[in-house]
Each structure stands twice: as structure tokens, then as C-alpha cells.
């Protein structure tokens, strides 16, 4: 953050921090940048720097005889014994994300802030040779579109393996600020690309698979890396109409908070046993998230079952933001105290390190209050083997991972697999795709590659990326396969200049196939950057229209790229546009993946995990309106409540082959169940009655086409009489991916449906089973349907602790 006025740090902290920290700040809000408008915090070097990392020496160092080095003691006892050795200044110096360590104890500095959204970021990459790159996977929104939970887990496991290899070389931390499990509620949001999409049940499954993949199979004894579920909670706006994320106060009903904005964090804490949670910049209902004990204690620890000694980190500078711009605290010292007492253990920033001494002097905090958070952090580090000897792999199975493991896991080519599985075929007129090598031999085919994504490299990665081993553009991929490529950028992402149109039309004229690759990228959607419009930007549609007019009988394929959707209704309705695909941010192998989908080496089976709205949607009501249900100018948010007509619906996705979907022998078309009977079933092994399976939705899936293909399924529920109005249009209750269904083969799809899938959330936030009639239906086509009648008395299956 930009701070122009300063005053000395409290004297008791100055001796330790004088060399590491600049002077502290004056307390007048008027002195600072207006963070109600500015969405990027100006972080100090101490916060953002990456530092060389090393392990404490428990064999020969000063700590060798202390309990912290006793591998038979509990992680908490070991951590608590270490923190008890700190002076107050040393304790405070280790409350920030860049912990300064304690040199007299042989405790190295530690950097909490490592990123792992879709690969290692904020690692200490070498300039060349070993450790100069790590695998860069597709952005989560594309990976989730594959509807393959095993794939999510595998990606996270690879990231964790590579992270531990880097950690062993002193180049990466033992915890990561990932995953981002906020839901992509409004299409203008700049960080939707980082998320699993707009559906909260998808986000919850993504959270579970990613977190358990990152943390390993035995996190209590051998934590691989500590995951951080972020951003908790109600965070999904960056800077829309100058409403800065740093100062937003989001008004959210208890109903929506319970039903939409927190279930994924509940699953992360209760089921995935996430070791860390990040509180968000924004306030919810008047209280900054990092100063809200209702969020951090009542919900997270008392209700969601957060692990006993898990720690909460602020988003970077969010502790400071409690003071400026929220104005919830009268000074930075007061803001630090508010955050500590609410349950924010570690400050990603420098507010704690500069001002906690003042908080203690003012009587707002005790040493014990501060110790609690640092003990929690170091408990996690103990679980990850930070203090353990490296004598045998049996002591810690991850301490001998090395560069060879990075090479091995990258060679599995899972980044490519994730991209090909996630790409969504939106339109395919007259089955023009795939452009097979038989019909279009590479040696005799000229491909015009046009548009601002046609030669994309870094663009493929989206945001939060580190060094990738390679970045394959669409142009390079087609050239590598032997096609002659006529490349012309034609226009930029947001350009209104037509100076490149002539070259683009010339490239198309002499080609056999025209591929336009465009859409949006991180110049329009990013952290601290929302879109104002969800129309295609600049003059891209004008160029596509000219290409369509000039195409004649040539195939014109449009690749719609970027994390958020754009209104492609004109392309959907243009008969000259042969095919339309959504490719997201496909990662290091993105060009290969796009090429192989187009040419049929891989067949598409992804489905949209966001709604493609008409452009007018973003102009109808404020993006800061958090109410999901339709009211006034708000036509309803997400596919669950939207009352308008989508361009392409959530769950849309085409195949190259055809599938016949029918009821299986185990499908019962009507099921009657008694609520009290359901709830009397044994469920002691489950964390919640909401997880109890009620029935299996089954269907026969037969490949009736000419190509082997994966098949993806979404099962939706709807009701018009169970519980009070208004009723959602439908909601997702399960999904799956069947791999490699051969031509003529029939597979049985089996999707379990749990108690929670039939529960509706009342105005108090309670999840309730109401008597009534539900319909379960397969995909958007609804060819397989099951009627479920719940009888008996309504029952609360999950009690929501309202905020007093």
C-alpha cells in the first residue's frame, strides 16, 4: 500500500525490526491512497519478497535438546515449546507472512506466502538448469469443466510433489495460498478464472479433491504441503465501478451465506481437513472478514470443524484494511488487535509486525493472544516435517524429493490431459469438427490462424503462474504437426483499429481452414480488475464477421478463450461460423490441446461450469448485489436462479459422437421416501447426516456415433412444492465422467444423491428437508428423469448458527 506519512515504530520492536522494516505509519486515513477505489494494495518489500529457505538443524543446532526437536512429542506440544522460547519482540517478528525467524535459536526465516493455484508460483526459481521451472496446469475453471474429480486430485498431488522438491532445495515453502474456492457468482469478476465456476457443489468437490491432493494421504502424521482455502468469505468483486475489494462491504443474507457463500469452506474444513484458511479483504454485513469472530470462530472452528490447530492467514494487507479503508478500527494497532482477537493468526502483510507492541501497550492484547496464532503456524510446520531429521525416508516420505521428481511428474503430461478434457464444444454445425487428418492431411492443408490468441504463449497460463517448462501456442502446435500456417493477428483483445484486418483476410483467403482465436485475457480479467462488459471486447466480432463473409465453404472455427464468458450469441446464430469452442486458459500445453481437439486426436467432453449470459445481463443490476434470488432489477444469479435466457447454459457441452441416454435396469422412475425414515438410518461414520446417500441416480449411456469418446454427466434436481417459494429453477446434485466409451458400447452411469441435495435453506440459514416432490434429470437434455417424493414432517438436517 502507498503510505506517505510515517512515525517511528514502537520502541520495543524497533531494535529487532529496524533493519527489516521501514517506519510505521501515521494514523490519519486522509493521508493514504483511497482504498475504497484502489483495488491493489501497495505491499512493502518485506511482505512480497521471496527469501532463501532452510531447515532448522535439530541434530547440531541450538534447538537440538529442546522439545521442538523431539519427534515423539505431539506437533502442538513441540510448537508451543518453541514459541515459549521467543522474546516478545521475536514473537511479534514472526507474526507476518515473512517470519524473520530467531537467529539465536538457529530458527531460519520462513515465508508463508507461496502460491499453487495451478502450479508453483512465488518459488525461488533458478536462472537455468534444475529448479528453473515447474509444471503449469490449466486454470481451475477449465480443469473443473472436465468433470473429473480424480484429475483435480492428481493435479494437486503433482503440484505438491513438485513443491516439496523445491522446498527441499530451499526454494519453496511448506504451505500454499491455494485453492481459491470462491464461487464465480457474477460474470464480470476478474478472478473467476481461478475458481471451479459458479456452482457451490462443484466448488465443494473441487476443494476436497484439491486440498487432499495437496496435503497428502496422512496430513496428521506426514503433511505434504498445507493448503489454504481462500478467500473466506463473500469475496467475488475486484474493482467493479470503482468498488474496491479492499473496502467492499457485502450485504449477504443468512440464507445466501449458508447456502452459497460458505458450503465449500465447510467441506474444506470438515472433510478435507484443510490446515489453513485465508480471510478475505471485504467486509460482510459491516464487519471486515479478518476481524469477524463470527466467521473465524463461530462458523469456522465451532461449526465447520476446522482442525484444532489450523491457522488463519489474512489476505495480503487485509489486517491493515480493517483500519483503512474499512474504518472498523481507529488505528493500525487497534486493527491488529481486532484481527488477532477475532482469530486471524498470521498477517500477510506487516501490520502485526509493526503494531502489535502498541496493541499490548494499549492493553488490547496479551502475549498469549499473539502466541496462539504463531503456535498454530508452527504446529503445521512440525506436521510437515520442518524440524525433523533427514536420516531416512521413513522419518518423512517427502524430504528426499528432488528435481528428478519434478521432471518425472511433468513428463506424465497431465497438464495436456486436463486441457483436452476441459475444453468445451459449444457449437458444431453440420459436424464440421473434427478436421481429421484423413479429410485435411497436414502436408496438404493450409490453416489460417488469426486473432490475438493465435500465437499466445504466456496468455495460455492465466494468472498466478510461475516459470513453465514450455508454452505451446496454437500456431506452434499446428506448425509442429506439419500444417502450413498463415498467421495474422488481425486485431488485439481490446483494439478498435482495423489496420490488421487486410492481412487477416488475406491469410484466410489462401487457406483451407480458418481458425480465429480470441476472446478475453488478463488485460481485461485479473486480480484487482473486473470487466465492465461481458460482450466480446474491441472489434473482434467485426473481424470474425468479415472472415465469415469471406469464408465461403471453408470451415471457420472460433476459439473463445479466457476464464469468464463473453456473449457469443452472434457467433451461435451465424451460419457461416462452423464451430465454436471455449478453451479457458489451457496451460503450458494449451496449443497442443486445442489443435488435437480440433483435429480429432482428442474428442471434447467438457461442460460449461458458468452460464454464458447475454451482454445485457451485466448492465441490469449492480455486480455488488449479492442476493441470488430474483428481485427488482436483479433477474437472479447463477443458473440456479436466473430467470432470463442464457446464450449457453451452465452444463452445456457437445460431443463429436452421439450418445443415447436411457433408464437402466436399476433405475426406478418414481421413488417415495419418508423423511423420518431417512434420518433414522445409521450414519455414525459420516461427518454430517447431509452426507448420507439417499439413492443412486442411474442411466444407461450408449455410444451410438462413430467415434470413441468420454461422456460427462450432470444430474440436476428441481421442485415446485417442497418448502417455501421462490423455487430455484434447478440445482446440481451430482456429476461424473465416463472415460473412453467405445462405439456401440453401453455403460451404466451411477451418481449417488445425498440427503443434503434434497435440503433447502430457509431464511435463518438452516438446511431443511421439506416434504414434497422433486425431479432428478440428466444433463440439459433431461432424457432420463426420476421422480422423488419426500413424505413425513419437515426436519432440520443442518443447523445454521445465526449471528447475534
Swiss-Prot record:
GO terms for molecular function: alpha-L-arabinofuranosidase activity; xylan 1,4-beta-xylosidase activity. Residues 1-26 form the signal peptide. Its EC number is 3.2.1.37. GO terms for cellular component: extracellular region. It is found in: Secreted. One of its GO terms (biological process) is xylan catabolic process. It comes from the Eukaryota. It catalyses: Hydrolysis of (1->4)-beta-D-xylans, to remove successive D-xylose residues from the non-reducing termini. Keywords: Carbohydrate metabolism, Glycoprotein, Glycosidase, Hydrolase, Polysaccharide degradation, Secreted, Signal, Xylan degradation. Glycans are attached at residues 29, 124, 148, 242, 251, 357, 390, 413, 444, 455, 573, 665, 696, 718. Pathway: Glycan degradation; xylan degradation. SUPFAM superfamilies: (Trans)glycosidases (SSF51445), Beta-D-glucan exohydrolase, C-terminal domain (SSF52279). Pfam families: Fn3-like, Glyco_hydro_3, Glyco_hydro_3_C. The keyword Plastid does not apply. The active site is at residue 315. Xylan 1,4-beta-xylosidase involved in the hydrolysis of xylan, a major structural heterogeneous polysaccharide found in plant biomass representing the second most abundant polysaccharide in the biosphere, after cellulose. PANTHER family: EXO-1,4-BETA-XYLOSIDASE XLND, SUGAR HYDROLASE-RELATED. Belongs to the glycosyl hydrolase 3 family. This is Exo-1,4-beta-xylosidase xlnD. It comes from Aspergillus awamori.
Amino acid at each position: 500500500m502507498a503510505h506517505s506519512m510515517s512515525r517511528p515504530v514502537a520502541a520495543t520492536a524497533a531494535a529487532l525490526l529496524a533493519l527489516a522494516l521501514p517506519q510505521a505509519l501515521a494514523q490519519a486515513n486522509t493521508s493514504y491512497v483511497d482504498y475504497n477505489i484502489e483495488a491493489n494494495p501497495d505491499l512493502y518489500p518485506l511482505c512480497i519478497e521471496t527469501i532463501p529457505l532452510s531447515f532448522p538443524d535439530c541434530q547440531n543446532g541450538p534447538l537440538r535438546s529442546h522439545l521442538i526437536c523431539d519427534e515423539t512429542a505431539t506437533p502442538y506440544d513441540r510448537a508451543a515449546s518453541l514459541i515459549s522460547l521467543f522474546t516478545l519482540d521475536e514473537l511479534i517478528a514472526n507474526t507476518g507472512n515473512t517470519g524473520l525467524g530467531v537467529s539465536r535459536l538457529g530458527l531460519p526465516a520462513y515465508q508463508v506466502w507461496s502460491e499453487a493455484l495451478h502450479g508453483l508460483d512465488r518459488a525461488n526459481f533458478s536462472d537455468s538448469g534444475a529448479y528453473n521451472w515447474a509444471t503449469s496446469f490449466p486454470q481451475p475453471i477449465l480443469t473443473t469443466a472436465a468433470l473429473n474429480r480424480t484429475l483435480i486430485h492428481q493435479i494437486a498431488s503433482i503440484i505438491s510433489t513438485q513443491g516439496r522438491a523445491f522446498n527441499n532445495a530451499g526454494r519453496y515453502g511448506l504451505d500454499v495460498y491455494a485453492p481459491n474456492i470462491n464461487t464465480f457468482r457474477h460474470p464480470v469478476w476478474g478472478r473467476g478464472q481461478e475458481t471451479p465456476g459458479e456452482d457451490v457443489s462443484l466448488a465443494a468437490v473441487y476443494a476436497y479433491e484439491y486440498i487432499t491432493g495437496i496435503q497428502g494421504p496422512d496430513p496428521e502424521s506426514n503433511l505434504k504441503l498445507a493448503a489454504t482455502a481462500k478467500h473466506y468469505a463473500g469475496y467475488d468483486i475486484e474493482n467493479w465501478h470503482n468498488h474496491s475489494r479492499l473496502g467492499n462491504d457485502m450485504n449477504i443474507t443468512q440464507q445466501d451465506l449458508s447456502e452459497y457463500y460458505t458450503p465449500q469452506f465447510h467441506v474444506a474444513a470438515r472433510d478435507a481437513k484443510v490446515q489453513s484458511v485465508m480471510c478475505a479483504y471485504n467486509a460482510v454485513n459491516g464487519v471486515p472478514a479478518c476481524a469477524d469472530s463470527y466467521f473465524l470462530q463461530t462458523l469456522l472452528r465451532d461449526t465447520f470443524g476446522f482442525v484444532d490447530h489450523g491457522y488463519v492467514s489474512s489476505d495480503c494487507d487485509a489486517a491493515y484494511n480493517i483500519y483503512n479503508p474499512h474504518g472498523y478500527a481507529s488505528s493500525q494497532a487497534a486493527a491488529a488487535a481486532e484481527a488477532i482477537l477475532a482469530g486471524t493468526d498470521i498477517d500477510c502483510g506487516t501490520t502485526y509486525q509493526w503494531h502489535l507492541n502498541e496493541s499490548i501497550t494499549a492493553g488490547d492484547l496479551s502475549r498469549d493472544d499473539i502466541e496462539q496464532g504463531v503456535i498454530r503456524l508452527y504446529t503445521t510446520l512440525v506436521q510437515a516435517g520442518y524440524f525433523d531429521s533427514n536420516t531416512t525416508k521413513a522419518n518423512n516420505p517427502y524430504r528426499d524429493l528432488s528435481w528428478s521428481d519434478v521432471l518425472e511428474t511433468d513428463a506424465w503430461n497431465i497438464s495436456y490431459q486436463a486441457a483436452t478434457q476441459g475444453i468445451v464444444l459449444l457449437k458444431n454445425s453440420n459436424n464440421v469438427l473434427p478436421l481429421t487428418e484423413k479429410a485435411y492431411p497436414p502436408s496438404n492443408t493450409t490453416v489460417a490462424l488469426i486473432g490475438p490468441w493465435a500465437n499466445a504463449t504466456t496468455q495460455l497460463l492465466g494468472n498466478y503462474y510461475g516459470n513453465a517448462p514450455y508454452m505451446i501456442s496454437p500456431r506452434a502446435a499446428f506448425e509442429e504437426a506439419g500444417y502450413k500456417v498463415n498467421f495474422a493477428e488481425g486485431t488485439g483483445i481490446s483494439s478498435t483499429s482495423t489496420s490488421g484486418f487486410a492481412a487477416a483476410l488475406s491469410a484466410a483467403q489462401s487457406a483451407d481452414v480458418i481458425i480465429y482465436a480470441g476472446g478475453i485475457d488478463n488485460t481485461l480479467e485479473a486480480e484487482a480488475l473486473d470487466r465492465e462488459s461481458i460482450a466480446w471486447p474491441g472489434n473482434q466480432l467485426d473481424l470474425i464477421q468479415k472472415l465469415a463473409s469471406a469464408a465461403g465453404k471453408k470451415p471457420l472455427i472460433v476459439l473463445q478463450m479466457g476464464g469468464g464468458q463473453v456473449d457469443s450469441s452472434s457467433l451461435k446464430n451465424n451460419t457461416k461460423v462452423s464451430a465454436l469452442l471455449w478453451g479457458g486458459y489451457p496451460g503450458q500445453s494449451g496449443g497442443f490441446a486445442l489443435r488435437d481437439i480440433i483435429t480429432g486426436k482428442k474428442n471434447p467432453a467438457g461442460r460449461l461450469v458458468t452460464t454464458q449470459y447475454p451482454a445485457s445481463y451485466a448492465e441490469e443490476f449492480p455486480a455488488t448485489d449479492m442476493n441470488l434470488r430474483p428481485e427488482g432489477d436483479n433477474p437472479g444469479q447463477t443458473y440456479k436462479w436466473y430467470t432470463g435466457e442464457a446464450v449457453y447454459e451452465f452444463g452445456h457441452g457437445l460431443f463429436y459422437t452421439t450418445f443415447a441416454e436411457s433408464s437402466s435396469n436399476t433405475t426406478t422412475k418414481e421413488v417415495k421416501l419418508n423423511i423420518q425414515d431417512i434420518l433414522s438410518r445409521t450414519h455414525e461414520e459420516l461427518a454430517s447426516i447431509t452426507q448420507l446417500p439417499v439413492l443412486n441416480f442411474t442411466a444407461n449411456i450408449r455410444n451410438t456415433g462413430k467415434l470413441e469418446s468420454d461422456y460427462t454427466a450432470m444430474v440436476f434436481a428441481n421442485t415446485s412444492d417442497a418448502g417455501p417459494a421462490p423455487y430455484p429453477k434447478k440445482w446440481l446434485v451430482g456429476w461424473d465422467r465416463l472415460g473412453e466409451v467405445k462405439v456401440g458400447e453401453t455403460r451404466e452411469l451411477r451418481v449417488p444423491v445425498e440427503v443434503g441435495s434434497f435440503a433447502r435453506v430457509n431464511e435463518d440459514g438452516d438446511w431443511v428437508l421439506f416434504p414434497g416432490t422433486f425431479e432428478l434429470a440428466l444433463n440439459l437434455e433431461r432424457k432420463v428423469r426420476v421422480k422423488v417424493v419426500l413424505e413425513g414432517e419437515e426436519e432440520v438436517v443442518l443447523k445454521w448458527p445465526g449471528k447475534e
